[in-house]
Design a protein with these regions (language model features):
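A charged N-terminal "starter" segment
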Residues: 1-110, 115-128, 165, 169, ...
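C-terminal active-site-proximal or functional interface alpha/beta core segments in diverse enzymes
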Residues: 186-254
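Internal alpha/beta core interface subdomains
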Residues: 165-179
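A general structural detector for well-ordered alpha-helical segments in enzyme core domains, enriched
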Residues: 30, 55, 73, 98, ...
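Short beta-strand segments
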Residues: 46, 113, 131-135, 174-176, ...
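Conserved radical SAM core fold
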Residues: 73-75, 95-98, 135-147, 177-182
Length: 254
């Protein structure tokens, strides 16, 4: 057995270094679960979920995109030889130095939720395509991200008007219902809000073709969430490019 092959001398109780036990087959099975339940969605893995190089290499080989929130995360993906076109800089409030770095790395897609961010992007990365992050109801989630990120729908017209004034290219909408979401209907509500944001984009002369549906997917109720997402997408959207966050790893790495 595998246990019989463990070198007890190098794994004794006095060892000073921690380690993870990884089942990459589980990561692959989680990916296939995505393909089965949400075949119309292009997965973008949130690197912050687990930046273990073996996991990242596997997901890159499977063709996933990557959701990065920092310069370090972006660099780790680029160092693997992944094209910058497969990266979304999903941090809506970045330091000016981060925006300059993204421009130098040819990152062409990022999120925003405030006017100050638009001014920074106009100054340091004006050719970047933008995704407006909207606020959703994350009250049923373990980790509620709405206290930090996301523009209320009432603010979206003002943001889009400023983006148009600055001649910036807004291409879509993103949201996050919060990590550890136990209410599948939260996704329907978020997709309904996203539809309204798409309509606001059209009113400001934009044609959105990108929707990032965030993360929050739980292992135990993923099929229930996927059912709601499929139904809501049929109700509110035609065939767009959709990007979920990072639910491929939690059950595969301990």
């Amino acid at each position: 057995t595998v246990l019989d092959q463990i070198d007890v001398d190098t794994c004794d109780a006095d060892g000073e270094n921690a380690f993870f036990v990884a089942d990459l087959a589980m990561v692959y099975r989680q990916y296939m679960r995505w393909v089965r339940e949400l075949p119309q969605i292009i997965p973008f893995y949130a690197v912050k979920c687990n930046p273990e190089p073996l996991v990242l290499h596997l997901l890159a080989a499977l063709g996933l995109g990557f959701d990065c929130a920092s310069n370090g995360e972006i660099q780790s993906i680029i160092d693997m030889g992944v094209s910058p076109s497969r990266i979304i800089y999903a941090n809506p409030c970045k330091a000016s130095s981060f925006v300059r770095r993204a421009a130098s790395q040819n990152i062409s897609l990022t999120t925003f939720d405030n006017i100050d961010e638009l001014y920074k992007i106009k100054r340091f990365h004006p050719k970047c395509k933008l995704v407006v992050r909207i606020l959703t109801d994350d009250s049923k989630s373990v980790c509620q991200l709405g206290i930090k990120f996301g523009a209320p729908l009432a603010d979206v017209p003002r943001l889009l008007a400023k983006a148009r004034e600055l001649e910036l290219d807004v291409v879509g909408v993103s949201f996050h219902v919060g990590s550890g979401c136990f209410d599948p209907e939260a996704y329907r509500d978020a997709l309904c809000r996203s539809r309204k944001a798409f309509d606001m984009g059209r009113e400001h002369g934009y044609t959105f073709d990108f929707l990032d549906i965030g993360g929050g997917f739980e292992h135990d109720n993923f099929e229930a969430i996927a059912k709601v997402v499929r139904s809501a997408l049929l109700d509110y959207f035609p065939d767009h490019e959709f990007a979920p966050g990072g639910s491929l790893v939690p059950s595969g790495l301990r």
